[in-house]
Amino acid sequence: MPGLVIEREVLIEAPAEVVWRTITEPDQISQWFADRVDLVVEPGAHGYMQFGDQGGLVVVETVERPRRLSFRWNYPAGEEPVTGNSMLVEFTLTPEGDERTHLRVTESGHELRDWPGEERQRYADEHREGWAEYLDRLSSVLADRRPG
């Protein structure tokens, strides 16, 4: 059985600055991740992300342009995301030359939720599958923008 901490990595055919904009600008985020994004990416900022008919609050924790971004998110909407009731998502971008970026996404916090163990594992598994799909979408969105 996979653990409760999710780690996904992908090599993206785009410069780090382009990847950064795509993971931090609301109109870009909605092309590969959440359906609706109301968020300013600065430390301590509060926002909201909508996925289909579900959404949740978001609190930005770390912003180190263009290398690192982290935020806490929670659902159901209404609860303030804090340690213990939310997941921490961390994006780490590492340039691979001028035209490629290694992106690592880590999501933790499932182990701290007060859900029964089976439910906690189910959510972690769903998020693990979700991140694989979202990173595929991100890569596709950026590949479609490449000239030629």
Regions flagged by a language model, labelled:
Residues E79-A132:
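Beta-strand/loop substructures that line and gate deep hydrophobic ligand-binding cavities in soluble
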Residues A16-E17, E61-R67, T92-H102:
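A short, structured loop/turn motif at beta-sheet edges
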Residues P66-N74:
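Short, solvent-exposed secondary-structure boundary/capping segments
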